[in-house]
C-alpha cells in the first residue's frame, strides 16, 4: 500500500529514464529551490501545502492565479487537494528535468531534505514503512468501527486521525464516535440518494416507453395519413390528441427533473444539518461529561462531609456518655460524702449532748454542796438550773 502522493513504479521508472542524464550540480540547485518554495508556501509547518498556499506566492512569482492553479493541478496527480514535500519536489523535477532516484542512486529524497537535511535512503525506507503501518492501523480501526466502506478513502479523516493519535490520543474515542455517527448519516443519505435515483430511473424508463409508444402511434398515423382522405379526419384528431399527450408527458418529465434537483438539494441540506447536529451532539456530550465529573466530585465531597459529620456525632455521643458516667460517679460520691457527713453530724450531736449532760450533772452536785453550807435560804431552785441552749433541741435533765 503506497502512501499519499507517492508516484507509482511506472512513473518512477519514467522519471528516472527522463532525468537519468542530469548532473548532480543542477539537481542539488533545483532541490534547494524546491525546498525554498515549499517552505515559503508551508508557513504553518503543516508538512503539506494546498492550492491556497501556492497562490500565496503570487507576489513572489511572475505568475497569475490561474497559472498557479494550473501548476498545482498538474502537480496534484492523486487529486487529494494537497501536496506533500515529496510530490512537490518530484513535480518540479518533472518540469525542470531533475528528480531524485529511488533505486540505486544514494541521493536524498525531497521530503528528507525538508525534514532532516541529512538522512539517507535507509531512513526514507523506514519513514515509508512507518507511514504504511499507520495506514494499515487506520484501515484496521475503520474496519473495526464498520465505517471503512464510507470513510476509507477520505484523506482528511486519515490526516486528522493520525494527528489526534500523535498529539491528543485521549480524544480518539470521541473522534471514533463522531466517525460512526457521520458514517451512519452518510449511509442514510446514500440510501436516500439511491432510492431517488432508482425512482428517477424507473420514471425515465416509463417515460421512454410512453414516448416510444407515442412515436410508434405517430408513425402509424403518418402511415395512415397516406391512405384515402375519407379516413384522415378521425386519424388527424387522434394524432393531435397523441401529440398533446406527448407534450404533456414531456412537461411531466421536466417537472420530474426539477423535482429531482429539488430533492437532491434537500438531501445535501439534510446531510449538512446531520453533520451540524453531530457536531452539536459531540459538544453536548463533552459538556455532559464535564458536568458528570463535577457531579461525581460534589457527591464524593458530600459523602466525605457526611462521614465526618457521623464521626463527629458519634464522638459527641461518646463524650456525652462519658460525661454522664462521670456525673453519675460524682453524684454517688457526693451522696456517700453526704451520708458520712450526716453520720458524723449525728455522732457530734450525740457527743455534744453527752458533754452537756455531764456538765449539768456536775452543776447539780455543786449546787447541793452549796445548799448544805449555812447561808440564806432560797425557795427558788432555778438558780442552779442552766437555761436551755438555743438550737440544741434538748432540755437539761433536772436532778
From Swiss-Prot:
This is EF-hand calcium-binding domain-containing protein 4A. The modification Phosphoserine is found at residue 3. Residues 181-358 form a coiled coil. GO terms for molecular function: calcium ion binding. Residues 33-61, 67-95 form the EF-hand domain. Residues 1-25, 216-239 are annotated as: Disordered. Residues 216-226 have a biased composition (Basic and acidic residues). It comes from Homo sapiens. InterPro entries: Ca-binding_regulatory, EF-hand-dom_pair, EF_hand_dom. The gene is CRACR2B. Keywords: Coiled coil, Phosphoprotein, Repeat. Plays a role in store-operated Ca(2+) entry (SOCE). Belongs to the EFCAB4 family. Transmembrane segments: none annotated. GO terms for biological process: store-operated calcium entry.
Amino acid at each position: 500500500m503506497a502512501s499519499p502522493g507517492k508516484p507509482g513504479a511506472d512513473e518512477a521508472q519514467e522519471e528516472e529514464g527522463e532525468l537519468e542524464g542530469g548532473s548532480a550540480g543542477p539537481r542539488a540547485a533545483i532541490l534547494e529551490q524546491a525546498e525554498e518554495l515549499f517552505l515559503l508556501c508551508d508557513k504553518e509547518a503543516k508538512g503539506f501545502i494546498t492550492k491556497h498556499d501556492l497562490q500565496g506566492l503570487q507576489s513572489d512569482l511572475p505568475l497569475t492565479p490561474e497559472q498557479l492553479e494550473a501548476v498545482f493541478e498538474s502537480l496534484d496527480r492523486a487529486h487529494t487537494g494537497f501536496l506533500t514535500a515529496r510530490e512537490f519536489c518530484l513535480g518540479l523535477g518533472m518540469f525542470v528535468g531533475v528528480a531524485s532516484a529511488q533505486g540505486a542512486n544514494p541521493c536524498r529524497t525531497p521530503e528528507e531534505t525538508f525534514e532532516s537535511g541529512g538522512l539517507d535512503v535507509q531512513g526514507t525506507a523506514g519513514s515509508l514503512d512507518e507511514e504504511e503501518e499507520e495506514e494499515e492501523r487506520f484501515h484496521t480501526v475503520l474496519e473495526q468501527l464498520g465505517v471503512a466502506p464510507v470513510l476509507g478513502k477520505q484523506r482528511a479523516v486519515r490526516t486528522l486521525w493520525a494527528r489526534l493519535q500523535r498529539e491528543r490520543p485521549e480524544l480518539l474515542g470521541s473522534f471514533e464516535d463522531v466517525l460512526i455517527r457521520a458514517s451512519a448519516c452518510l449511509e442514510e443519505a446514500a440510501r436516500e440518494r439511491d432510492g431517488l435515483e432508482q425512482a428517477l430511473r424507473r420514471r425515465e424508463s416509463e417515460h421512454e416507453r410512453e414516448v416510444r409508444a407515442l412515436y410508434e402511434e405517430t408513425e402509424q398515423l403518418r402511415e395512415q395519413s397516406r391512405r384515402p382522405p375519407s379516413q384522415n379526419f378521425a386519424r388527424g384528431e387522434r394524432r393531435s390528441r397523441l401529440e398533446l399527450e406527448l407534450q404533456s408527458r414531456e412537461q411531466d418529465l421536466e417537472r420530474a427533473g426539477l423535482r429531482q434537483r429539488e430533492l437532491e438539494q434537500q438531501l445535501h441540506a439534510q446531510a449538512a444539518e446531520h453533520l451540524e447536529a453531530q457536531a452539536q451532539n459531540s459538544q453536548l456530550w463533552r459538556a455532559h461529561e464535564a458536568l458528570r465529573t463535577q457531579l461525581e466530585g460534589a457527591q464524593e465531597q458530600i459523602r466525605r462531609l457526611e462521614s465526618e459529620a457521623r464521626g463527629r456525632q458519634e464522638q459527641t455521643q461518646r463524650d456525652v456518655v462519658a460525661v454522664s458516667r462521670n456525673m453519675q460517679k460524682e453524684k454517688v460520691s457526693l451522696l456517700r460524702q453526704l451520708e458520712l457527713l450526716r453520720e458524723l453530724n449525728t455522732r457530734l450531736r450525740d457527743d455534744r449532748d453527752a458533754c452537756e449532760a455531764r456538765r449539768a450533772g456536775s452543776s447539780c452536785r455543786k449546787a447541793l454542796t452549796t445548799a448544805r453550807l449555812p447561808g440564806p435560804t432560797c425557795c427558788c431552785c432555778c438558780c442552779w438550773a442552766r437555761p436551755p441552749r438555743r438550737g440544741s433541741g434538748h432540755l437539761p435533765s433536772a436532778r
